């Protein structure tokens, strides 16, 4: 199977292959297959819409990790009119799993920070598979404080399985780095908008995920643990990941129903990877609207609302 297609996308892959075969055959001067191609293209649109109308939580989890899904730098290249990356935590190193810098979106100057995965094996290793170490979170914090100093709104793009769990990260106090970011983000005296663009995994996501607005792309996920990790703990069997995904309620739709996020940003039919330009344009429009709305909120009110939001996390009622 083509690695760019997930298992449940196989009918889509088959139709696209047929369309490509017909187009190749029509290269000859005496062959006209326009009618057949249009019919297959219409069938492809209908089949894609049908498949994506009834996705399970596990299928959405797979989409959130799709190898062609746009990453932070992909969105930056389209959403931002200007971007100047800033590197290093000024203590140890520059963690490539976190990217960030000064940006301009339309007329709006902002600070933008996000997780960054890799497209090929070389880049995945360089980016540590999008799993930051303490120096990554300390770099992020440095940029957050810089944004606060200059009164720039902060935008974060979340896309990680979680913080790096290696011994080297623990030796450099991973938990402290995450905890410090949570504390500092809660008190930042600037508007903060957090957007889950792919995977939102545990504390590794939360460390750049505390803000005044939390947005999620339609086929992104946000959870305390991966479905595989949850299945391994609860059932001692990672093969039960699909069951775990349902129990974790990790989809954007479910989290919106629970009141844990503010907005679900609709993706193109078939997912963000099928039309990154369209997805980025939608994201840009939403971010500009949210920034405009937050401009009207006094700073004291903004902080009070942020604190109230944090205190409601985990609260529930028995009925």
Swiss-Prot record:
Localization (cell): Cytoplasm
Lineage top rank: taxon: Bacteria
Keywords: ATP-binding, Cytoplasm, Fatty acid biosynthesis, Fatty acid metabolism, Lipid biosynthesis, Lipid metabolism, Nucleotide-binding, Transferase
Cysteines joined through disulfide linkages: none
One family name in Pfam for this protein: ACCA
GO molecular function list: acetyl-CoA carboxylase activity; ATP binding; carboxyl- or carbamoyltransferase activity
PROSITE patterns: COA_CT_CTER (PS50989)
EC numbers: 2.1.3.15
Pathway, per record: Lipid metabolism; malonyl-CoA biosynthesis; malonyl-CoA from acetyl-CoA: step 1/1
InterPro entries: Acetyl_CoA_COase_a_su, ClpP/crotonase-like_dom_sf, COA_CT_C
Swiss-Prot/TrEMBL catalytic activity: N(6)-carboxybiotinyl-L-lysyl-[protein] + acetyl-CoA = N(6)-biotinyl-L-lysyl-[protein] + malonyl-CoA
Enzyme class name: transferase
Keyword Membrane: no
Record's keyword annotation contains Lipid biosynthesis: yes
Domain CoA carboxyltransferase C-terminal: 32-293
GO terms for biological process, alphabetical: fatty acid biosynthetic process; malonyl-CoA biosynthetic process
GO cellular component, one term: acetyl-CoA carboxylase complex
HAMAP family the record matches: AcetylCoA_CT_alpha
Main function: Component of the acetyl coenzyme A carboxylase (ACC) complex. First, biotin carboxylase catalyzes the carboxylation of biotin on its carrier protein (BCCP) and then the CO(2) group is transferred by the carboxyltransferase to acetyl-CoA to form malonyl-CoA.
PANTHER family: ACETYL-COENZYME A CARBOXYLASE CARBOXYL TRANSFERASE SUBUNIT ALPHA (PTHR42853), ACETYL-COENZYME A CARBOXYLASE CARBOXYL TRANSFERASE SUBUNIT ALPHA, CHLOROPLASTIC (PTHR42853:SF3)
Entry's family note: Belongs to the AccA family.
Subunit record text: Acetyl-CoA carboxylase is a heterohexamer composed of biotin carboxyl carrier protein (AccB), biotin carboxylase (AccC) and two subunits each of ACCase subunit alpha (AccA) and ACCase subunit beta (AccD).
UniProt name for this protein: Acetyl-coenzyme A carboxylase carboxyl transferase subunit alpha
Organism expressing this protein natively: Xylella fastidiosa (strain Temecula1 / ATCC 700964)
Gene, per the UniProt record: accA
């Amino acid at each position: 199977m083509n690695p760019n297609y997930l298992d449940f996308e196989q009918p889509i892959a088959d139709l696209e292959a047929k369309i490509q075969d017909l187009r190749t055959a029509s290269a000859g001067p005496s062959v006209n297959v326009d009618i057949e191609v249009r019919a297959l293209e219409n069938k492809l649109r209908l089949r894609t819409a049908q498949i994506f109308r009834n996705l399970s939580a596990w299928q959405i989890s797979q989409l959130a990790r799709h190898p062609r899904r746009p990453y932070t730098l992909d969105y930056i290249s389209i959403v931002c009119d200007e971007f100047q990356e800033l590197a290093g935590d000024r203590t140890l190193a520059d963690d490539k799993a976190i990217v960030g810098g000064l940006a301009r979106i339309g007329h709006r100057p902002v600070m933008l920070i996000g997780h960054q995965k890799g497209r090929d094996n070389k880049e995945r290793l360089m980016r540590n598979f999008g799993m930051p170490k303490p120096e990554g979170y300390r770099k992020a914090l440095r940029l957050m404080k810089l944004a606060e100093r200059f009164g720039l709104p902060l935008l974060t793009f979340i896309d990680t399985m979680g913080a790096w769990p290696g011994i080297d990260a623990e030796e450099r106090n991973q938990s402290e780095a995450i905890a410090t970011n949570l504390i500092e983000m809660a008190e930042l005296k600037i508007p903060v908008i957090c957007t889950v663009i792919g995977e939102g995994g545990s504390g590794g996501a939360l460390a750049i995920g505390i803000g005044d607005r939390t947005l999620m792309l339609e086929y992104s996920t946000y959870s305390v643990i991966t479905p595989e990790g949850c299945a391994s703990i609860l059932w001692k069997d990672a093969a039960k990941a699909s069951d775990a995904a349902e129990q974790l309620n990790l989809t954007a739709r479910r989290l919106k129903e629970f009141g844990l996020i503010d907005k679900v940003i609709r993706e193109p039919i078939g997912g963000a990877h099928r039309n990154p330009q369209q997805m980025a344009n939608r994201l840009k429009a939403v971010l500009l609207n949210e920034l405009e709305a937050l401009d009207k909120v006094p700073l004291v009110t903004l902080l009070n609302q942020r604190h109230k939001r944090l205190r409601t996390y985990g609260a529930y009622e028995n009925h």
